[in-house]
A protein has these predicted regions:
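A residue-level detector for the "anchor" residue at the start of short, highly conserved motifs
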Residues: 1-187, 193
Length: 195
């Protein structure tokens, strides 16, 4: 998906994928008989068609993180330039596999409202309950903020508008924001003004 745009695609098995700005997904024109595999660089929301005979597997680019499901709804944020990969489970269950700092393969079973964040540098994970609505608000062209630090707000705007921000003054970094802004018909500076 191009910068500043979001969109949806239908995969060969009927699964639907919402793609966030600057997201790339690779998949075959036809899935194998025993598995359905895609490779993701960016952020995507998956609504996977249930198929008990074929796992659905998402590989994050340049990482040793995979997500396996049979049929469920989940969001993955795996931009290769991020220092992390995160997965948020909306419904069903998923198994997230990763390789830790000792090069051992580890697996976590996620339940609805769980969020896992894999640190690409430290090669460890943190799992917690999350605000699912906030994590997937980008699908509707909305930025949903709940006591969100400035750095996170600017990162989100960077993804939406393909711009970079410079913060002058460390006192601003301690600011946090709460609210909702629809950005589909706004420019970056207009969105900032609404915040």
């Amino acid at each position: 998906m191009n910068s500043g745009m979001t969109g949806t695609i239908m995969l060969p098995d009927g699964s639907k994928v919402w793609l966030n700005s600057n997201t790339h997904i690779k998949y075959p024109s036809e899935f194998a008989q025993d598995r359905r595999e895609v490779e993701l660089n960016g952020e995507a929301y998956f609504s996977v068609e249930r198929d008990p005979n074929r796992k659905f597997i998402v590989h994050s680019v340049e990482d040793q993180v995979t997500i396996e499901v049979l049929g469920t709804d989940f969001n993955v944020d795996a931009y290769k330039d991020n220092g992390f990969v995160s997965a948020t489970l909306i419904s069903g269950s998923i198994r997230l596999s990763y390789v830790n700092a000792e090069k051992e393969k580890r697996c976590l079973l996620m339940r609805p409202e769980d969020k896992v964040i894999y640190d690409r540098v430290q090669k460890n994970v943190d799992m917690c309950k999350t605000d699912v609505e906030r994590d997937i608000s980008w699908r509707d062209g909305t930025i949903l903020l709940r006591d969100t630090p400035l750095d996170e707000v600017l990162w989100t705007l960077s993804k939406c508008f393909n711009v970079e921000f410079e913060v002058r003054g460390d006192h601003l970094r301690s600011c946090s924001f709460t609210g909702a802004v629809s950005y589909t018909h706004l420019r970056a500076h207009e969105t900032l003004r609404h915040l």
